[in-house]
C-alpha cells in the first residue's frame, strides 16, 4: 500500500508539474503586465505631452477615417492623462467574441498612433489577453482548460498526500546521507508550499470552466 501511495504521489506530481510551472510563470508575467505593455506598445499608448486636447468628437472622426467608416463604434476610452492616447473601439465582424478593433488616437495632434485587436469594452491589450489565455488554458483551447482544471483538482491531493506519506515514513533517527538529504529537502519544500498549493487549487477551481460553474450554483443555492 505504501509503495502504491508513493507511486500515486509521484505520478500526480508528474501530471500537475507542467501546470504549476506555466501557471506560476504566467501569473508572474501578469503582475508585470503594465510595465511590459508600456514598453511593447509605447508608441500606441503615448502621444504629445503638451498642448490642448481636441474634443472627443474630433478624435472619433479621425478613428472612423482610419477604419474607412465601415465599422460600428463600440466604445471610447478617453486618454487618462496628458501624453497618453484615446482608445476608440469598433465592432468588427471578422474578430472573435468580445474582441474589437481599437484605434489609438493622439488627442492633441489628432493622429492615429496604433491599430490593434483588443478584448472587452475596456480594451484589454493583446499581450495581457495572451497571458490570460496561457494562464487559463495553456493556449490549448478547451483541452488546455480541461487539463488545467484536472491539475488543479489533483493538486490538493498531491499536497495532503505528500504530508501523509511524510507522517507515515519519516525516519526515527536523523541520517546524513544523500537519500535522506534529498527527502528532507522535498519535505521542507512540501511544507513550505502546502498552504499556497491548497489556495491555488481552490481559487483555480473557482475560476475554472466546469467546476467554477458548479461553485457558482452552490453559492447561489446557499445565498453566498
PLM feature segments, named:
Residues 1-224:
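Conserved histidines in hydrophobic membrane contexts and catalytic metal-binding motifs
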Amino acid at each position: 500500500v505504501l509503495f502504491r501511495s508513493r507511486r500515486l504521489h509521484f505520478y500526480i506530481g508528474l501530471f500537475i508539474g507542467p501546470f504549476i510551472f506555466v501557471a506560476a510563470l504566467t501569473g508572474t508575467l501578469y503582475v508585470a503586465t503594465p510595465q511590459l505593455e508600456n514598453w511593447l506598445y509605447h508608441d500606441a499608448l503615448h502621444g504629445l505631452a503638451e498642448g490642448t486636447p481636441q474634443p472627443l468628437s474630433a478624435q472619433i472622426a479621425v478613428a472612423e477615417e482610419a477604419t474607412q467608416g465601415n465599422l460600428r463604434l463600440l466604445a471610447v476610452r478617453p486618454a487618462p492623462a496628458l501624453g497618453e492616447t484615446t482608445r476608440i473601439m469598433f465592432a468588427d465582424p471578422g474578430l472573435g467574441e468580445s474582441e474589437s478593433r481599437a484605434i489609438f488616437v493622439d488627442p492633441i495632434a489628432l493622429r492615429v498612433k496604433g491599430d490593434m485587436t483588443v478584448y472587452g469594452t475596456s480594451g484589454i491589450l493583446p499581450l495581457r489577453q495572451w497571458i490570460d489565455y496561457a494562464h487559463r488554458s495553456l493556449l490549448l483551447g478547451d483541452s488546455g482548460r480541461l487539463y488545467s482544471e484536472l491539475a488543479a483538482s489533483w493538486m490538493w491531493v498531491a499536497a495532503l498526500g505528500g504530508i501523509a506519506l511524510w507522517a507515515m515514513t519519516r525516519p526515527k533517527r536523523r541520517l546524513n546521507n544523500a537519500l535522506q538529504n534529498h527527502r528532507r529537502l522535498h519535505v521542507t519544500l512540501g511544507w513550505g508550499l502546502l498552504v499556497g498549493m491548497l489556495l491555488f487549487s481552490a481559487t483555480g477551481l473557482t475560476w475554472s470552466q466546469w467546476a467554477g460553474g458548479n461553485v457558482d450554483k452552490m453559492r447561489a443555492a446557499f445565498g453566498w
